[in-house]
């Protein structure tokens, strides 16, 4: 029970820090966001599946949704490549720009649908038992 209490306490502190961070970056321009590594943090959060962070930051500063890496892959590209379903579902909350995000190609000419067709990370596949279940999960991502 003490361990759960410590986790909740830590989570509460992290939420306070996130709220403070959101207040601070809400008025930042693109150059300030780059200098603060906010774009990199968004991409890392997408890779790790930290939905709460991405959602709070995008509400504070919608420009953060346009974060891209050196391969011109954005938040939702990273979510798909790492099979982070909850992050990908945030796309439904994006007003008016869904189609632009969905159709945007990376440096290799791949859009979100192409990335969904790639095989997921081996660590993700190893956690599932049986080839049939792995294939089923990959087909669900492609759909």
Sequence positions of predicted segments:
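Acidic, Ser/Thr- and Pro/Gly-rich low-complexity regulatory segments
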Residues: 1-143
């Amino acid at each position: 029970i003490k361990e759960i209490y410590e986790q909740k306490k830590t989570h509460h502190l992290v939420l306070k820090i996130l709220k403070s961070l959101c207040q601070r970056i809400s008025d930042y321009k693109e150059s300030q966001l780059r200098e603060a590594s906010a774009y990199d943090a968004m991409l890392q959060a997408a890779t790790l599946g930290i939905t709460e962070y991405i959602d709070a930051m995008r509400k504070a500063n919608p420009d953060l949704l346009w974060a891209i890496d050196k391969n011109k892959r954005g938040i939702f590209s990273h979510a798909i490549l790492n099979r982070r379903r909850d992050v990908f579902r945030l796309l439904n909350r994006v007003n008016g720009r869904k189609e632009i995000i969905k159709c945007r190609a990376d440096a290799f000419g791949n859009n979100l649908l192409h990335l969904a067709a790639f095989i997921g990370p081996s660590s993700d596949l190893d956690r599932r038992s049986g080839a049939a279940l792995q294939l089923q999960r990959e087909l669900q991502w492609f759909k």
